[in-house]
């Protein structure tokens, strides 16, 4: 019974050992994993290289051509969090559009403020009726309701070419450009005297924006949220991967979202609650046609204010050159405002917020803030849209038809929208200035009142235009390198082993392998080859596209800020790929997609997740069947440094083992043992052995002499003869009488000293022979005992095997009996099997004991042989 229990325990331990085998760290290359990043983006545009428009010139100098075959890959079973307030692309686009704006409206002169006292009187201007040629408006637009700006004729003294003389100059200024001196009715100054430096435009500019796209460099990608209910922040479950954004117009405007993209389904309100200036951005699903126009002619004069510096002003006025208007269809405008308020209510109610059912304008501040400000053909329009919004009410019953007209003014002194500065631009151009745009949304902020209620208020934050356009995008860095536990271990290095190299070819699209991001780790790892090929293919393809685009327009490219960005994007991709390959090489995984290692996996390296827990018996199976690579990467993110270090140490040890193995590889062939280059080595070994034996003999002789000296003997060599001297006083005769003294007898000496040396060498060789003979005899006895043990073990195994077969056959035959008989026979068979197993187990134990005793007696036999040889 005890034997049966022991066998059962052994079987259980064996089964458990098989079930809980060791897992090792395995490196995977080509897994669908990404992390948020902020790389240098580059732009693409469909610019006309033949156009001399400054915006087209800027685009051809700084942007690559559009990809003729843009692609988009949908990620299944993936949910990602988006937040438009944390999108760094908005700030980057603001800086780029600021550069574009300054290049298009390039000021070439910095002027000291024209701050001299002027005596001004109001003058009359000739009014003119404006006719509209658009089909969306009525044939004639009556602008009598739009007040004319007052024009003042101002006189001041100016220094002539002779510094000690002055002359009086007359110039015309708009009332909005001058400010009255306190306490004096006729004394005025220019309005910009509180600015230290102003810039003035040299030539009249035009600005016809074309859409540009922002693209991620190779090794990076753009995630795009396609959820229809996304409103600026939250989880997005419908995600796709793109290389570039959609075309975004570099519009510079406040309050209204012009020429942007439209929502696919219904109007949406984007809102992310922040501490200050909370943006409330509305995007329509149907655009509104907007027409803005200014007609009239004028001539311009100039005032010389210093060497090479000229201040342009109005000399002769024909009509009001700053008077303009914008018009929309009333029905379309009010309908879209209804949709906008409904979208705002939906978004705010989802956040448990209340909204005032009205649209407001800021009452105080710069004119760019209190009015609708935009640029049309190089002219800056300031439009008052209060009558468009104040006439709208929620839940109104009457439908308004016709055309809504808003009064606008053109200004010459403009506040910069991106930085704190001002610019003085040339007076309005001659002829008609007319623009057609599409209103695609509203740019507002949510102002909170004392009742914790929000009021939509039109905003002058220009970058909010790009914020809503880029709200659905996120830049990520693709990280195809990951580690995970697998039961496989890196095999040991063998001699003459050549590592097979697998070429990673170019095949699929770059971002296509991210389509497996929603699959489990086990399912995604099956397609690692295709995914890694897609990764490398995409890097190479994107670099090739970039080079082709640069070569196509290299005669126009200049190494500007954007030119440097293009080079940075290219170098970033190459450096990223080289970095991954260097890590793989350090771990001994170069050119491998799945690389096993000898580093045991530690459970503490991965954090617990809601899907898989460390205490689960099937933890590793849970990882591969339930987690995605993206989820797994987040669990091991904090331990990657430790894992990478251990992988590098393991590879270093592997290289050392390989070096030692290569040193032994020269003995792998039997013929190499007879190589003539090894003979000197053999002779050296023989000399060492002989010297060791001689030294051992000398040492034993010294020990023997010391032993005899301690017993009182004279230390003489055993082979040197000595004469036995006789006492001279002792008679040498025989008994019975005295006789004469006998002569002293000498023992004959050996033939010579070499005989003594020969005798020692003979004894030494005999001792060596006897020692080796004893050793070989002991080894032979041990091998015989081991052979007998193996034979006995094999015989026992055969008997056990036959007995088991017989028992199985008996069990099969007995299975046809009744239940009671089967129970009795089964118990008997188990008892018999237990008794028999105990018998051969004892035999094995006895054999092992016999072998162990033989091995243990080997030193004793050697010692006995040495004693026999030395004595």
UniProtKB/Swiss-Prot annotation:
Residues 706-871 are cytoplasmic. The record marks 502-503 as: Cleavage. Residues 154-193 are annotated as: V2. Residues 383-408 are annotated as: V4. Residues 1-21 form the signal peptide. Residues 567-583 are annotated as: Immunosuppression. One of its GO terms (cellular component) is virion membrane. Residues 663-684 are annotated as: MPER. Residues 451-458 are annotated as: V5. GO terms for biological process: membrane fusion involved in viral entry into host cell; symbiont entry into host cell; virion attachment to host cell. Residues 22-684 are extracellular. Disulfide bonds join 43-63, 108-202, 115-193, 120-154, 215-244, 225-236, 292-326, 376-435, 383-408. Residues 502-522 are annotated as: Fusion peptide. One of its GO terms (molecular function) is structural molecule activity. Residues 292-325 are annotated as: V3. Residues 645-668 form a coiled coil. Glycans are attached at residues 77, 124, 127, 142, 153, 157, 185, 194, 229, 238, 259, 273, 285, 289, 297, 329, 345, 352, 384, 387, 395, 398, 438, 451, 496, 602, 613, 626, 638. Specific enzymatic cleavages in vivo yield mature proteins. Envelope glycoproteins are synthesized as an inactive precursor that is heavily N-glycosylated and processed likely by host cell furin in the Golgi to yield the mature SU and TM proteins. The cleavage site between SU and TM requires the minimal sequence [KR]-X-[KR]-R. Keywords: Apoptosis, Cleavage on pair of basic residues, Coiled coil, Disulfide bond, Fusion of virus membrane with host membrane, Glycoprotein, Host cell membrane, Host endosome, Host membrane, Host-virus interaction, Membrane, Signal, Transmembrane, Transmembrane helix, Viral attachment to host cell, Viral envelope protein, Viral penetration into host cytoplasm, Virion, Virus entry into host cell. Some of the most genetically diverse regions of the viral genome are present in Env. They are called variable regions 1 through 5 (V1 through V5). The 17 amino acids long immunosuppressive region is present in many retroviral envelope proteins. Synthetic peptides derived from this relatively conserved sequence inhibit immune function in vitro and in vivo. The surface protein gp120 (SU) attaches the virus to the host lymphoid cell by binding to the primary receptor CD4. This interaction induces a structural rearrangement creating a high affinity binding site for a chemokine coreceptor like CCR5. This peculiar 2 stage receptor-interaction strategy allows gp120 to maintain the highly conserved coreceptor-binding site in a cryptic conformation, protected from neutralizing antibodies. These changes are transmitted to the transmembrane protein gp41 and are thought to activate its fusogenic potential by unmasking its fusion peptide. This is Envelope glycoprotein gp160. It comes from Simian immunodeficiency virus (isolate TAN1).
């Amino acid at each position: 019974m005890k034997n049966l229990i022991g066998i059962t325990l052994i079987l259980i331990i064996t089964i458990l050992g098989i079930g809980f085998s060791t897992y090792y760290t395995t490196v995977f290359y080509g897994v669908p994993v990404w992390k948020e990043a902020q790389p240098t983006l580059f732009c693409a545009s469909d610019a006309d290289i033949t156009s001399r428009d400054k915006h087209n010139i800027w685009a051809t100098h700084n942007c690559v051509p559009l990809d003729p075959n843009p692609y988009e890959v949908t990620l299944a079973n993936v949910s990602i969090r988006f937040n438009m307030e944390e999108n760094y692309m908005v700030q980057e686009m603001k800086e780029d559009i600021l550069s574009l704006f300054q290049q298009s409206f390039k000021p070439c002169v910095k002027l000291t403020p024209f701050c001299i006292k002027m005596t001004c009187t109001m003058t009359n201007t000739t009014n003119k009726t404006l006719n509209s040629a658009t089909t969306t408006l009525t044939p004639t637009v009556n602008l009598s309701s739009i007040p004319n700006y007052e024009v003042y004729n101002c006189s001041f003294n100016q220094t002539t070419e002779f510094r000690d003389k002055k002359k009086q100059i007359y110039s015309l200024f708009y009332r909005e450009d001058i400010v009255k001196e306190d306490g004096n009715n006729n004394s005025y100054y220019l309005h910009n005297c509180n600015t230290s430096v102003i810039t003035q435009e040299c030539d009249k500019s035009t600005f016809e924006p074309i859409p540009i796209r922002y693209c991620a460099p190779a090794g990076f990608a753009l995630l795009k949220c396609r959820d229809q209910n996304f409103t600026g922040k939250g989880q997005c479950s419908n995600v796709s991967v793109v290389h570039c954004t959609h075309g975004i117009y570099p519009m510079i405007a406040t309050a209204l979202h012009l020429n942007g993209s439209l929502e696919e389904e219904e109007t949406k309100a984007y809102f992310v609650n922040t501490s200050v200036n909370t943006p409330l951005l509305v995007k329509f699903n149907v655009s509104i046609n907007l027409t803005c126009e200014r007609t009239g002619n004028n001539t311009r004069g100039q005032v010389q204010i210093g060497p090479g510096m000229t201040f342009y002003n109005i000399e002769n006025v024909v009509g009001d050159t700053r008077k303009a208007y914008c018009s929309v269809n009333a029905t379309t405008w009010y309908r879209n405002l209804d949709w906008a308020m409904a979208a705002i209510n939906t978004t705010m109610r989802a956040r448990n917020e209340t909204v005032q059912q009205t649209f407001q304008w800021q009452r105080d501040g710069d004119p760019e803030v209190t009015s609708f400000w935009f640029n049309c053909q190089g002219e800056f329009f300031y439009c008052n849209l209060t009558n468009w919004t104040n006439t709208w009410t929620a839940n109104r019953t009457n439908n308004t038809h016709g055309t809504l007209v808003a009064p606008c003014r053109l200004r010459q002194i403009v506040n910069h929208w991106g930085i704190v500065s001002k610019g003085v631009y040339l007076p309005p151009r001659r002829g008609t200035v007319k623009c057609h745009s599409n209103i695609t949304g509203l740019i507002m902020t949510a102002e909170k009142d004392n009742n914790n209620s929000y009021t939509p208020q039109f905003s002058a934050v220009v970058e909010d235009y790009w914020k809503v356009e880029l709200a659905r995008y996120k830049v990520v860095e693709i990280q195809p390198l990951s580690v995970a536990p697998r039961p496989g271990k890196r095999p040991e290095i063998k001699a003459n082993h050549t590592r097979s190299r697998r070429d990673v070819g170019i095949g699929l699209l770059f971002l296509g392998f991210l389509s497996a991001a929603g699959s489990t780790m086990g399912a995604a790892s099956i397609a690692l080859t295709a995914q890694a090929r897609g990764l490398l293919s995409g890097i190479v393809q994107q670099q090739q596209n970039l080079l082709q685009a640069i070569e196509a327009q290299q005669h126009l490219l200049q190494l500007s800020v954007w030119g440097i960005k293009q080079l940075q994007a290219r170098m970033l991709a190459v450096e990223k790929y080289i970095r991954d390959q260097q890590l793989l090489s350090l771990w001994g995984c170069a050119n491998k997609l799945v690389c096993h290692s000898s580093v045991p996996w530690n459970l503490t390296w991965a954090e617990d997740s809601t899907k898989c827990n460390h205490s689960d018996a099937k933890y590793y199976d849970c990882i591969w069947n339930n987690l995605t690579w993206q989820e797994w990467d987040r669990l091991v993110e904090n331990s990657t440094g430790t894992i990478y270090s251990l992988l590098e140490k393991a590879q270093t040890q592997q290289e050392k083992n390989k070096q030692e193995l290569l040193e032994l590889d020269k003995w792998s062939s039997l013929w190499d043992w007879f190589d003539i280059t090894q003979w000197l080595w053999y002779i050296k070994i023989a000399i060492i052995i002989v010297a060791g034996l001689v030294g051992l003999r000398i040492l034993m002789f010294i020990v023997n002499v010391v032993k005899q000296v301690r017993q009182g003997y004279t230390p003489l060599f055993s082979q040197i003869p000595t004469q036995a001297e006789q006492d001279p006083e002792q008679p040498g005769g025989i008994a019975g009488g005295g006789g004469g003294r006998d002569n002293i007898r000498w023992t004959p000496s050996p033939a010579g000293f070499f005989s003594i040396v020969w005798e020692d060498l003979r004894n030494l060789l005999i001792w060596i022979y006897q020692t080796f003979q004893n050793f070989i005899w002991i080894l032979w006895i041990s091998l015989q005992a081991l052979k007998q043990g193996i034979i006995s073990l094999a015989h026992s195994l055969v008997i056990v095997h036959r007995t088991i077969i017989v028992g199985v056959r008996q069990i099969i035959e007995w299975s046809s009996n009744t239940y009671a008989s089967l129970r009795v026979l089964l118990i008997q068979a188990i008892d018999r099997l237990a008794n028999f197993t105990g018998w051969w187990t004892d035999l094995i134990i006895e054999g092992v004991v016999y072998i162990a005793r033989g091995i243990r007696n080997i030193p004793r036999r050697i010692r006995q042989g040495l004693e026999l040889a030395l004595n």
